[in-house]
Amino acid sequence: MFGGKGGLGNLMKQAQQMQEKMQKMQEEIAQLEVTGESGAGLVKVTINGAHNCRRVEIDPSLLEDDKEMLEDLVAAAFNDAARRIEETQKEKMASVSSGMQLPPGFKMPF
């Protein structure tokens, strides 16, 4: 079931190594900053890996337009940044599990 002699011990060792790699990767992701944009770059929102907003940049030309449009652009830029950070997290976490000999049908929780 676990690849013969020493298979279970080897699997446990791999699991521990993967856990250590995931811990390190989560710490790295928390430090990441990603910028999302909307309105062809007129609004930019920068968030970190914990989805905390770090910075909002608004082109001065938008300050003369209606408030509702500006609010929509800020929300869209934040959503773009959140999508980008999610993609980055998935890519980094997938790299942690590459090379591991997982049982058939086993899926990672990310």
Curated annotation (Swiss-Prot):
Gene Ontology MF: a single term: DNA binding
Keyword tags: Cytoplasm, DNA-binding
Stored Pfam families: YbaB_DNA_bd (PF02575)
InterPro entries recorded: YbaB-like_sf (IPR036894), YbaB/EbfC (IPR004401)
A GO term from the CC aspect: bacterial nucleoid
Subunit structure comment from the entry: Homodimer.
Function: Binds to DNA and alters its conformation. May be involved in regulation of gene expression, nucleoid organization and DNA protection.
Protein name in UniProt: Nucleoid-associated protein ESA_02800
Naturally occurring in which organism (per UniProt): Cronobacter sakazakii (strain ATCC BAA-894) (Enterobacter sakazakii)
Upper lineage: Bacteria, Pseudomonadati, Pseudomonadota, Gammaproteobacteria, Enterobacterales
